[in-house]
From Swiss-Prot:
May be involved in cellular signaling or cytoskeletal functions. May play a role in morphogenetic control. It catalyses: L-seryl-[protein] + ATP = O-phospho-L-seryl-[protein] + ADP + H(+); L-threonyl-[protein] + ATP = O-phospho-L-threonyl-[protein] + ADP + H(+). Its EC number is 2.7.11.1. Keywords: ATP-binding, Kinase, Nucleotide-binding, Serine/threonine-protein kinase, Transferase. ATP binds at residues 366-374, 406. Residues 123-136 form the CRIB domain. Belongs to the protein kinase superfamily. STE Ser/Thr protein kinase family. STE20 subfamily. The gene is SKM1. InterPro entries: CRIB_dom (IPR000095), CRIB_dom_sf (IPR036936), Kinase-like_dom_sf (IPR011009), PAK3-like (IPR051931), PAK_BD (IPR033923), PH-like_dom_sf (IPR011993), PH_domain (IPR001849), Prot_kinase_dom (IPR000719). One of its GO terms (cellular component) is plasma membrane. Present with 238 molecules/cell in log phase SD medium. Residues 3-118 form the PH domain. This is Serine/threonine-protein kinase SKM1.
């Protein structure tokens, strides 16, 4: 068939009255459509044809083995069967669930769909765009005018209003530039940045207008119990409640069978944050929907806001207050640094080039991410002790110990440099508040196994998920201030170690703080970390998780290790209120608020002590020079309130 990009047999089902039925179909991806046929002849009308322009999200789920979900927008013009039309509203979102035969097929379909869908693959910046543009809001059409097409698409699906524009139009522009660059870097073809002279004029309030927003039923779509599993980095993430499917057996190694009934009962884990359980959310009141919506934001694992992990390399900026742009030479450097053979050779300075399967028994699958799967495992044999890479780590290893293993298919990773970066940093970072890297193995230059200490307490997010709610719908934290102070103090100790080595973590949040059964607190996930040098004492790369980002990153200014201090302050708010500021906003609106509002405020400041508020104030200074360093934070009275590890163990029982 002409224009076919990928085709093959799959099983699928759609949400609706007969959503329990899985049907075998021949799936064809071309330049414009995703078509489902009854046979591989494809000589008849497809059973279902989905325009690629309507696909808003694709994410892996565990509804079935080797399964992923496609979220698509629908309208009145779409051909929907009468029996299902009752369940769908105009401009709503619908899900299609697709199961493939093998893991490789699944990754192949995900890659192909991401590459062809315009709403997923990012939009490159306009080039040679130098004329003066009059940007504003037209009350007649209820939309923004005079903006580039890529920005118009973003604004149409965001909650940014004409009031936001009037209040701070420059912050809106900054949010748009950041969002587009953040999502579009991997598809940039060395284009120059948008070079626009914007005429920013205040807008008159229209008597009547309509802003195109996402509907509440789209955003508030999944229950808290399904919010599990972020494994974008090579570090392990633990899921204390779910036990997902095991990896299929292969010829030379047999994995332990794992019961999957619980997964089938509880449903999806890696779900699209805008799709799941629409029929359930329609039954919820506004208060309950608001609760669900706020937690869709926290684990935005496969959303359009974070489709790829960006490289840690960044151009230096001479002027701290000037806007930093991507330059061709920086992108060329990034491209050259991602040479697969060179990266694998560097990995082998840390990783052992042998098959590790005889050394471990994989007990159960603990998580699944874009880069690979995490398994809870048991060490059954020690590798050869004369290997210098094994001896270098100085970690005590014993047969029978439990470890976490991240398996990564290197051939399927678009940015191997990020994995190498994380591997090298972990190998060189031995400190009691940083998760221990034990060893790593490379199998035939194709697969990387990273062996880490097992933190059975899970991540801090698991504890925060155990919150109780008052009648007003507000969060009440399961942690008291003494426990919060202990977690923050231990995190500060880990950050002090990193900052002394001129390393910025750049992604501090509750998901990346792990605990063990003894109440010890450790930092994980070094995929975004970067090293400061004399040549580059400031960085400008747009990385991290947006809701925890410092304003200087959103404003695309140079930054240093104090971005970790800001994120630490946001994490403390997260512990107090159960979520970071603006989590109930769509990503673009959240970026605008970070750029516009400055230091976020507690919803109920009277609920915490003066010491806590003083600590937060020191962390959340917009002026970087006024923001405290980690070394300074360790002297604050708030941290003297810290409890003992034993007193934190009580909260670990919540999950």
């Amino acid at each position: 068939m002409k224009g076919v990009k990928k085709e093959g047999w799959i099983s699928y089902k759609v949400d609706g009255l007969f959503s329990f039925l899985w049907q075998k179909r021949y799936l064809v991806l071309n330049d414009s459509y995703l078509a489902f046929y009854k046979s591989d002849k494809c000589n008849e009308e497809p059973v279902l044809s989905v325009p690629l322009t309507s696909i808003t999200n694709v994410s892996r789920i565990q509804l079935k083995q080797n399964c992923f979900e496609i979220l698509r927008a629908t309208d009145q013009k779409e051909n929907i069967s009468p029996i299902n039309s009752y369940f769908y509203e105009s401009n709503s979102k619908r899900s299609i669930f697709i199961s493939t035969r093998t893991e490789r097929d699944l990754h192949g379909w995900l890659d192909a769909i991401f590459a062809k869908c315009p709403l997923l693959s990012g939009v490159s910046s306009p080039t040679n765009f130098t004329h003066k543009v009059h940007v504003g809001f037209d009350p007649k059409v209820g939309n923004f005018v005079g903006v580039p097409d890529s920005w118009a698409k973003l604004l149409q699906t965001s909650e940014i209003t004409y009031d936001d524009w009037n209040r701070n139009s420059k912050a809106v522009i900054k949010a748009l530039q950041f969002y587009e660059d953040y999502n579009g870097l991997d598809t940039m073809q060395f284009n120059d940045h948008l070079n626009t002279s914007l005429d920013l004029k205040p807008l008159k309030s229209p008597t009547r207008y309509i802003i195109n927003k996402r509907t509440n039923s789209i955003k508030r779509s999944v229950s808290r119990t399904l919010r599990k599993g972020k494994t974008d980095s090579i570090l392990p993430v633990y899921q204390s409640e779910l036990k997902p499917f095991p990896r299929p057996s292969d010829d030379d190694y047999k994995f332990t069978n794992i019961e999957d009934n619980k997964v089938r009962e509880e449903g999806r884990v890696h779900v699209s944050k805008e799709s799941t359980a629409d029929s359930q959310t329609k039954q919820l009141g506004k208060k309950e929907q608001k609760v669900i919506q706020s937690h869709l934001r926290r684990h935005d694992n496969n959303s359009t806001f974070r489709p790829h992990r960006l490289a840690p390399s960044a151009p230096a900026t001479k002027n701290h207050d000037s806007k930093t742009k991507w330059h061709k030479e920086d992108l060329l450097e990034l491209k050259n640094n991602d040479d697969s053979n060179e990266i694998i050779m560097k990995m082998k300075t840390v990783a052992i080039d042998v098959n590790p399967r005889p050394y471990f028994q994989l007990v159960e699958k603990a998580g699944q991410g874009a880069s690979g799967a995490v398994y809870l495992s048991k060490r059954i044999k020690l590798p050869q002790e004369n290997d210098p890479r094994f001896l270098k780590s100085h970690c005590h290893r014993v047969v029978g110990e439990r470890v976490a293993i991240k398996q990564i298919r290197l051939s399927e990773q678009p940015k191997k440099q990020l994995i190498m970066n994380e591997l090298l940093v972990m190998n060189d970072s031995r400190q009691e508040n940083i998760v221990n890297f034990l060893e790593a193995y490379i199998i035939d230059d194709e697969e990387l196994w990273v062996i880490m200490e097992y933190m059975e307490g899970g991540c801090l997010t698991d504890i925060l998920d155990a919150v109780a709610r008052s009648n007003t719908g507000e969060h009440s934290s399961p942690l008291n201030e003494n426990q919060m102070a202990y977690i923050v103090k231990e995190t500060c100790q880990g950050l002090k170690f990193l900052h002394n080595k001129k390393i910025i973590h750049r992604d501090i949040k509750s998901d990346n703080i792990l605990l063990n059964s003894q109440g010890l607190v450790k930092i994980t996930d070094f995929g975004f970390c970067v090293e400061l040098t004399e040549k580059r004492s400031k960085r400008a790369t747009m990385v991290g998780t947006p809701y925890w980002m410092a304003p200087e990153i959103v404003n695309q200014k140079g930054y240093d290790e104090k971005v970790d201090v800001w994120s630490l302050g946001i994490m403390l708010i997260e512990m107090i209120e159960g979520e970071p500021p603006y989590l109930n906003e769509d990503p673009l609106k959240a970026l605008y608020l970070i750029a516009n509002n400055g230091s976020p405020k507690l919803r109920h400041p009277e609920s915490v002590s003066k010491q806590t508020k003083q600590f937060l104030d020191a962390c959340l200074q917009v002026n970087v020079e006024s923001r405290a360093s980690v070394r300074k934070l360790l002297t604050f009275e708030f941290l003297s309130m810290a409890c003992s590890p034993e007193q934190l163990k009580v909260s670990l029982k919540w999950h």
